[in-house]
Amino acid sequence: MSERELTYGEAVKEAIAEEMRRDPRVFLIGEDVAEAGHPFKTLVGLVQEFGTDRIIDTPISEPGYAGIGVGAAMTGMRPVVDVMFGDFITLTMDQMVNQAAKAHYMSGGKIKVPIVFRTTLGATRRSAAQHSQSLHAWVSHIPGLKVALPSGPYEAKGLMKTAIRDDSPVVIFEDKMMYRVKGPVPEGDYTIPFGVAEVKRAGRDITIVATSSMVPVSLGAAKLLEDAGISAEVIDPRTTWPLDKQTLIDSAKKTSRALVVDEGYERYGVTAEIASVIADGAFYHLDAPVKRMGAMDVPVPFSPVLEDLTVPSERTVFEAARALCRR
């Protein structure tokens, strides 16, 4: 497969378009997804190709169109339900958690719910407390849901295609600050399997497990660590559920130190789960306690100066890793 560069947003759109051409059961529904092309312009042009029967604009009613999507999935369609801000998945909780996630189990496996909830996460866009939250830990907690967090354009396309083809409900969180980030994306068809982590950078002194936009942040920190004589291994889990526990454990056993970085809150969050996995599986190989880094325990501020302080940065990840290595 030949490669070219796409932005993260272009990769998402290409994945959806290719799957809609491949499978007539796929459709997309949400607010401002047709003529407006999505608030972040990631769907521009799709309605012109597929029409308003398959790119469906809805009123401002997340519970309503989420319910339409769940019902359509139960009856054989493959909907992509677009929730423009991750904060608004709070309005879809009954449809997502009580209906989509439960139907397969409650029907004894007779009902499949092949639905994708596509939404966002991430701060530093100056969108204030109600449009900047990272709530992926909430849904990672729910049996019956799969949760993907693409960290770049390649992952954005591959994970979306996997999600649309999956017979289970999938929630994809896209970091809205990454939509213009460019990266290599193969031209041919490809998918990325769920539950398979990727070692983004090999190292020997410390393992840094990072999700979503914290992957490039951690790779930047790894370069700073290299200058300080510390070799950092950076791992992208890609999915918080299913979680590739073995890759994380094996890396921590090799390096003897682990740092977990995520943009969600530390309290009862993704970092806590991953840290416990590493502590349980690699305890006798660790030379230091597993450290966690996440968002500050406050609503996301509107002030640019304060907002930037609430999430991990290359510098803070570098300092935390260096402290773990006692350098």
Enumerate the predicted regions with their spans:
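Thiamine diphosphate
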Residues: 1-169, 173, 176-327
